[in-house]
Swiss-Prot record:
Binding site for pyridoxal 5'-phosphate: G111, F112, S186, D211, D212, A213, H214, T241, L242, S243, K244
Name of the protein in question: Putative pyridoxal phosphate-dependent acyltransferase
Organism of this sequence: Oceanobacillus iheyensis (strain DSM 14371 / CIP 107618 / JCM 11309 / KCTC 3954 / HTE831)
UniProt similarity note: Belongs to the class-II pyridoxal-phosphate-dependent aminotransferase family.
The protein's assembly and partners: Homodimer.
Length: 396
């Protein structure tokens, strides 16, 4: 007999989420996740993927992944610390370090795993972490797992960060203090004030950690937010994903050799999870090589991002203060944002609504993610649909 308590808990809470318009229905994409997708037989302009550079469907990467399956199999077969470390993993990590301008790098199974692994391996109950109030959920969970004292500072507020860093240092309570931030904030598209953060870190001897999941492949000519500001020798820990702009799956942390040596023996997701698959490893390596060889895809991404932003702004939509191709249309009311997303879907645009608690209450939005793979015709069609629905709903 199964638990009646569990059944009651699930029924009550799922019903509550649905009543408040906060239950997320998951759509199934039929086929590849490209600039256009098909859901339940309906063709849609896709403005919701993280496939920034269109590499998830890149033909060269697909072919090299197939060859890796033939030569190395479909899986690594073990955790990295037993005999799951393949030559392909070492080659990938060397390429990541070269890409990020660091001594070494370590690859994980996902970006979320990176933050769970690296933060808790370096910080403990005798330490403190200064964390931006809008940091990603994986950072929040990684900080909690470390058992360090979590001190939130107001989003990108350098005065608040400096004051809280000063108080933490002067308290004498902590062995180590880390400051951690997203490089690019995924809900609003703004970029962290890394030069000022680094200055504060140097003033108070803080460990610097940048989660560049949405910056790698996008900012710094593709090399990320740390490179964008020329701070490769000033940031202790650079985290990034092999999904999003790279188009595959996995994540990494890059930094000094001593840091990577420590993570290999103390980060639990590395120690207790089977390694990244051979196909994913070689496809990720090739994607990074492509970014290092040419800025063409990166330039196309920014061109399309600027084009969509300008089109939506001219219509009168509130697109916030985004500094990257991420383009929110901030509606405000949560239910209205969800209705707007639904109407866009009906007219041929897939742009998911983002509501509380993912964003602050009263800032419900539809988040647009243009990619290098979109054509101008696709973006023009999307803008026209935005205009039609926006006027119908009296949003513009």
């Amino acid at each position: 007999m199964t638990s009646s308590k569990l059944d009651q808990f699930l029924q009550e809470n799922i019903s509550d989420l649905k009543d408040r318009g906060l239950y997320n229905e998951i759509d199934t994409v039929q086929g590849a996740n490209g600039p256009e997708i098909t859901i339940e037989g309906k063709k849609l302009i896709n403005l919701s993927s993280n496939n920034y550079l269109g590499l998830a469907t890149n033909n060269e990467m697909k072919e090299i992944a197939k060859k890796a399956i033939d030569s190395h199999g479909v899986g690594a077969g073990a955790v990295r610390t037993i005999n799951g470390t393949l030559d392909l993993h070492i080659e990938l990590e060397k390429k990541i370090a070269q890409f990020k301008g660091t001594e070494a790098a370590i690859a994980y199974q996902s970006g979320f795993n990176c933050n769970m692994a690296a933060i808790s391996a370096v910080m403990d109950k005798n330490d403190a972490i200064l964390s931006d109030s809008l940091n990603h959920a994986s950072i929040i969970d990684g900080c909690r797992l470390s058992k360090a004292k979590i001190i939130r500072f107001e989003h990108s507020d350098m005065n608040d960060l400096r004051q809280k860093a000063k108080e933490a240092v002067e308290s004498g309570q902590y062995n180590k203090i880390m400051v951690i931030t997203d490089g690019v904030f995924s809900m609003d598209g703004d970029i962290a004030k890394l030069p000022e953060i680094v200055d504060i870190a140097e003033e108070f001897d803080l460990i610097t950690y940048v989660d560049d999941a949405h910056g790698s492949g996008v900012t710094g000519d593709g090399a990320g937010t740390v490179k964008h500001f020329g701070l490769q020798d000033k940031v202790d820990m650079q985290m990034g994903t092999l999904s999003k702009a790279i188009g595959v799956i996995g994540g990494y942390v890059a930094g000094k050799q001593s840091l990577i040596d420590w993570l290999k023996v103390r980060s639990r997701p590395f120690l207790f999870s089977t390694a990244v698959s051979p196909a994913d490893a070689v496809a990720s390596k090739r994607a990074i090589e492509m970014l290092m060889e040419s800025t063409e895809l990166n330039e196309k991404l920014w061109e399309n991002g600027d084009y969509l932003k300008q089109g939506l702004k001219e219509l009168g939509f509130d697109i916030g203060e985004s500094e990257t191709p991420i383009t929110p249309c901030i509606i405000g009311d949560e239910k209205k944002a969800q209705e707007f997303s639904k109407r866009l879907y009906e007219e041929g645009v897939y742009a998911k609504s983002i509501v509380f608690p993912t964003v602050p209450r009263g800032t419900g939005r539809v988040r647009n993610m243009p990619t290098a793979a979109h054509t101008k015709e696709m973006l023009d069609d999307a803008i026209a649909i935005y205009k039609k629905i926006g006027q119908e709903m009296k949003l513009i």
